[in-house]
Amino acid sequence: LCQARMARLVYVSSVDALCLPERNEPVREPQRFFPEKLSTEYGRSKAESANMVLEAAKGGLSASVVLPSCILGPGDARRGFTSIMLQAYLRGIPPVSITGGYDFVDVRDVAQGILAACLTPGGSVYLLTGRYGSVKEVFDCLADYTGRPRTRLTLPLELLYPVLPFVSLYGAVTRRRMPLSSSALKLLAAHPLYDHSRATRELGFMPRPLEETVRDTAAFLLGRSVRS
């Protein structure tokens, strides 16, 4: 459809479509994706779709692929995984933190990156990532914003695996989306180092501080005004 109308296509994929290096090395944009090496259906579908877009770009379609990390920020009306996790903490659940973390990026910065990618030559792949933040760091930022005491107890991720079946059952019974799953724990256990320098160089992508993103997300979840 885009090719027929001479339109520009920017496919929003995910860093979950990437194969992480075995060593602690920077992760950069690939020339192609390898869905067969990924463990989750979500990652495989994103990788396969990205390959289709890149193949179409070789055939003349003006298209690019962007790879956001874990998107956080105000305006999440549907309450994704990260918003559910933050909202649970704001309600006092859980009273403890867990080890692990992830690379978080602000939704407003991702939107600006997508708009900038619309103006670039086709066939490009861009990492739209922020920086790594531990779960405890995010919870501490929430505590400081709300004036609550910081959590003192941090549990290892390994202790959560035995309770996953009960969490899943509770979610099914209450028809609620639960923030914990085996795939979520695996992501939190990894420590990827994404290199978004190409997006900075070619798109002017400059992600804002994680602390600002967490504060603005909390303000949105609490019904307070948020700066754009």
Tell what function each PLM region has:
Residues L20, K37-L67:
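Active-site Tyr-X1-5-Lys
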Residues G113-M178, H196, L210, V214-S228:
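Mid/C-terminal beta-alpha module of Rossmann-like enzyme folds, strongest
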